[in-house]
Amino acid sequence: MSVSKKPMVLVILDGYGYREEQQDNAILNAKTPVMDALWAKRPHTLIDASGLEVGLPDRQMGNSEVGHVNLGAGRIVYQDLTRLDVEIKERTFFANPVLTNAVDQAKNAGKAVHIMGLLSAGGVHSHEDHIMAMVELAAERGAEKIYLHAFLDGRDTPPRSAEASLKKFEDKFAAQGKGRVASIVGRYYAMDRDNRWDRVEKAYDLMTLAQGEFQADTAVAGLQAAYARDENDEFVKATVIRAEGQADAAMEDGDTLIFMNFRADRAREITRAFVNADFDGFARKKVVNLNFVMLTEYAADIKTTVAYPPASLANTFGEWMAKNDKTQLRISETEKYAHVTFFFNGGVEEPFAGEERILINSPKVATYDLQPEMSSAELTEKLVAAIESGKYDTIICNYPNGDMVGHTGVMEAAIKAVEALDNCIDQVTKAVESVGGQLLITADHGNAEQMRDPATGQAHTAHTNLPVPLIYVGEKNVKAVEGGKLSDIAPTMLSLMGMEIPQEMTGKPLFIVE
């Protein structure tokens, strides 16, 4: 009979940041006796989850992808956002062979260059400065037909903030004398990640057929009409932008399409609709043979050109566990499953030897304020069973509630989400203690602790750049170290497990055994 393992458990409370002011703070306004007691009685510290400490530009808010890559890597990983900023600043972006070839191919054949992406200064999935650089690259290389298909944000940015961005691009096209905004649509449609293909189809038809529910002469006019219909940026319905006498911007065989999002999870579905010959998410009314370029690799099985292929990370936490013959479990709901697997493993899709995965379906609701507890009860049940099973050396779990409900901007719902989590943490803590295991509770970035923007008074639906908690529960007598960051978590776990830390991990343990 094999000896029961005492697991090292990492619970990531997504979007659960630390802020001392109670005003508009869903976490401090919720009843959280369990987390309050843990914070009061257990070793704890605050860690950085944003900006330079996670490889993002200074003061840039953290996000789930970046957070999990840093958590699993045990070193600061410079993100695509920072990498692209540097490339554009140093002008190497304008010589990227994949991008220049794609533009030249269309130009030489008299075809159009279509550029699509999330038009946002949020910096989570994309950055409008990168899209602007792509517009400049296309114009500089002599492309005549340049069409921008703008996905609108309102989630990583204030709910109604797209007008300034659209105006900037309309001014740019006017100044350079070629190109235009061809369509606008909310990210709710274009950037789904939960197989809601009816949404994706609307965005796909808008771009391929130049057909939408609405039409406007200019992008700004189209946006203002959406606001008049009470649609915030995220939910703007498919709108064709075409003034009297302007050519149709429908996509044709031989056109180039460059997708300027750098984050993978919400880029995959629409990319597959364009690229996969055997795509079956919906019946495509028009299949276009495009020269399709992904800015970064959205998935290894999407067979199309990549402008910036991934840099590989050696000896992430998951790989190091496998090399040391340890068993590990990754568990979350649909919304954050990719984060505890693909992102935590440094962009590796395949599970490592000894790595098991459990996926709990997120509830099928339009927005999560309608079900703030999400699937946390089922997730907790499965997590507790895994802790008690004695099968795993380590377990990584993500609870999405703080982030997914925080994104809705609905304070009452976010409070309910936090209260549901407190009950879950109670069960998890008891299970870990009953088997003599160890538990770290932390977050990947903030969100629910700031539900209203103090400057604008609008709902605050974006992440924050505030620190996140880190709490230790276990039998070891440990002392917390100040000044930590997300990339210190993997070394902390290895140290608590009594394991060697690989040299590639430059993070430091945040709990020292006394």
Curated annotation (Swiss-Prot):
One of its GO terms (cellular component) is cytosol. InterPro entries: Alkaline_phosphatase_core_sf, BPG-indep_PGM_N, Metalloenzyme, PGAM_B_sf, Pgm_bpd_ind. It catalyses: (2R)-2-phosphoglycerate = (2R)-3-phosphoglycerate. CDD domains: iPGM. SUPFAM superfamilies: 2,3-Bisphosphoglycerate-independent phosphoglycerate mutase, substrate-binding domain, Alkaline phosphatase-like. Mn(2+) 1 binds at residues 403, 407, 463. GO terms for molecular function: manganese ion binding; phosphoglycerate mutase activity. The keyword Manganese applies. The keyword Cell division does not apply. Monomer. Belongs to the BPG-independent phosphoglycerate mutase family. This is 2,3-bisphosphoglycerate-independent phosphoglycerate mutase. It comes from Salmonella choleraesuis (strain SC-B67).
